[in-house]
Amino acid sequence: MFDTTPHSGRSTPSSSPSLRKRLQLLPPSRPPPEPEPGTMVEKGSDSSSEKGGVPGTPSTQSLGSRNFIRNSKKMQSWYSMLSPTYKQRNEDFRKLFSKLPEAERLIVDYSCALQREILLQGRLYLSENWICFYSNIFRWETTISIQLKEVTCLKKEKTAKLIPNAIQICTESEKHFFTSFGARDRCFLLIFRLWQNALLEKTLSPRELWHLVHQCYGSELGLTSEDEDYVSPLQLNGLGTPKEVGDVIALSDITSSGAADRSQEPSPVGSRRGHVTPNLSRASSDADHGAEEDKEEQVDSQPDASSSQTVTPVAEPPSTEPTQPDGPTTLGPLDLLPSEELLTDTSNSSSSTGEEADLAALLPDLSGRLLINSVFHVGAERLQQMLFSDSPFLQGFLQQCKFTDVTLSPWSGDSKCHQRRVLTYTIPISNPLGPKSASVVETQTLFRRGPQAGGCVVDSEVLTQGIPYQDYFYTAHRYCILGLARNKARLRVSSEIRYRKQPWSLVKSLIEKNSWSGIEDYFHHLERELAKAEKLSLEEGGKDARGLLSGLRRRKRPLSWRAHGDGPQHPDPDPCARAGIHTSGSLSSRFSEPSVDQGPGAGIPSALVLISIVICVSLIILIALNVLLFYRLWSLERTAHTFESWHSLALAKGKFPQTATEWAEILALQKQFHSVEVHKWRQILRASVELLDEMKFSLEKLHQGITVSDPPFDTQPRPDDSFS
């Protein structure tokens, strides 16, 4: 059972509510001393060791503060023992594998088991050039160190050919089978990426290495900027240059690909690659087949290593070297619609294409999941006002979501190209393990390419307070509004879960399951409401156009527009609406947005209508059979009741004897019947007596046989026989 309090058991002791209340009771004249430059102080620890009182402060208060500091140190040691920081894990890694080069630094470690005669539970440590495993079961230590250059094959396996939680690592002389992974796919991708870099003799820069560490362990590592080549975590809030954002996105694909594979939509990061890469899980299990599919990264190495190495992972960043195109040009980062759904209105194609390219280069989609990718028949400015202003649409949408205490601050900023605002509201929570509601603080940052640009990008960071493990994570969303035409705009919404501290695998899976469920429900509801607003807007525009056209016909009747006598025609507000082309790129919006010009039943497939008719006919037949069965049962019951009534009526209406002769005849018949019955009973009794006699005779013979065959019971000589 998980702790449902806002502060979980894995949070640091200094973040508990009781600890903060005690800190507030400390006198303001005694600030904690600053640590020396050469020392590091963990969060929640207190290095104050002064014993002297401060003038004007009661001695009881100083004694209480010293006791509190002592208790906080005990809690800090207890917390460090249960949840060691990255610094402690790295020190343990260097102690356990002291023969490795000193330049090797721990990137991530996973809990797993090595399959041998028995399962050896331990931890798998990954560095830039080595894979290490350590297990200690009742002083029985097992240590394995594998250099990545020596690995010839890397496969995903199944424990007992059923549970997909194992990885097999093969070298020229050995095979190691690691199982019981909590995040097998993520670990496999990271090992595969490091293996590729080792075979290609590529090294990670300090920035890339520390970004991987922060992705795996969070931002609180127990380190400072004075520890060797430590690099602080980079905040991906869209303020960096395109080159920096691209570099970091390429690295973050490693840790986020596990979540992207479970998404129904194709990953936006994967779609930005210059070539189509094979599926990693399929290609890595069959390395030779993967070598035939992708030949862009072959090197002259060992046969097995080169064949396995040439498989490019899904999250591979594009190479800077010029390569020959393998086939037709793939879609750009924003052209995710199939060819039959591409827009036919090319009046503003050049400007919209340039704007899409600029926005895609500046702020690409987040590396989590693409939740909305739809084209609406609404202008970009109007769509922005509907979503990011105090509009009736937003108010109605928040009321439908049952959000309360909504506070929208106005946009503030130096220019129209970069603005910021903060939203606060309370959301309902249906999770039985948590509270019924939670307060939310959402920070929105708006970016534009220019003051007159039609499109914009809004980054949103949502912090939910009052829920379990609130200090571990927060959610980030990116809204990208692109103006395609005067009355058309594309809305792309991507989301990801960002971690401040790395939780346990079980807690992380619980956080991701609940968070993604709520995020997907919210944005699917938003997409449906936008589709309804779009339909209402198109209907109102069609009515206005028809009213204007009828007025023109009344004034100029000879100039009435007719097409071969089919009736008056009027221009549609949009060519795509007239042709019935649905330009939405999301699967849910295709089912939730019917075409405007279609009839009430035109959007229903004929197969669905046929199935409905068959089901209705089957139900009618079943009802008729049930009625017939009920009638048959009722008829049988009524017939039986009728027969019984007739028999009783016949007895009731029978004629009784009137004279003495008739009574004498009846008495004679009764005596005769009685004598017959007595004779029958006598025969039955006589037969019973005969059977009893036979049984008695048999039992007597059996008793005689038993008495003769049994030996005498008294085998000991009697005492009086010895004297005779």
UniProtKB/Swiss-Prot annotation:
PROSITE patterns: VAST. Induction: Up-regulated in hepatocellular carcinoma tissues. Keywords: Autophagy, Cell membrane, Cytoplasmic vesicle, Endoplasmic reticulum, Lipid transport, Lipid-binding, Membrane, Phosphoprotein, Transmembrane, Transmembrane helix, Transport. It comes from the Eukaryota. It is found in: Endoplasmic reticulum membrane; Cell membrane; Cytoplasmic vesicle, Autophagosome. Residues 91-158 form the GRAM domain. The keyword Magnesium does not apply. Coiled coil: none annotated. Residues 563-575 have a biased composition (Basic and acidic residues). GO terms for biological process: autophagy; cellular response to cholesterol; intracellular sterol transport. Its main location: endoplasmic reticulum. Residues 367-538 form the VASt domain. Residues 1-18, 326-336 have a biased composition (Low complexity). GO terms for molecular function: cholesterol binding; cholesterol transfer activity. CDD domains: PH-GRAM_GRAMDC (cd13220). Expressed in liver. One of its GO terms (cellular component) is cytosol. The keyword Cell membrane applies. Residues 57-66, 300-312 have a biased composition (Polar residues). It is a single-pass membrane protein. Residues 1-66, 256-336, 560-579 are annotated as: Disordered. Cholesterol transporter that mediates non-vesicular transport of cholesterol from the plasma membrane (PM) to the endoplasmic reticulum (ER). Contains unique domains for binding cholesterol and the PM, thereby serving as a molecular bridge for the transfer of cholesterol from the PM to the ER. Plays a crucial role in cholesterol homeostasis and has the unique ability to localize to the PM based on the level of membrane cholesterol. GRAM domain binds phosphatidylserine in the PM and mediates protein recruitment to endoplasmic reticulum-plasma membrane contact sites (EPCS) in response to excess cholesterol in the PM. This is Protein Aster-A. It comes from Homo sapiens.
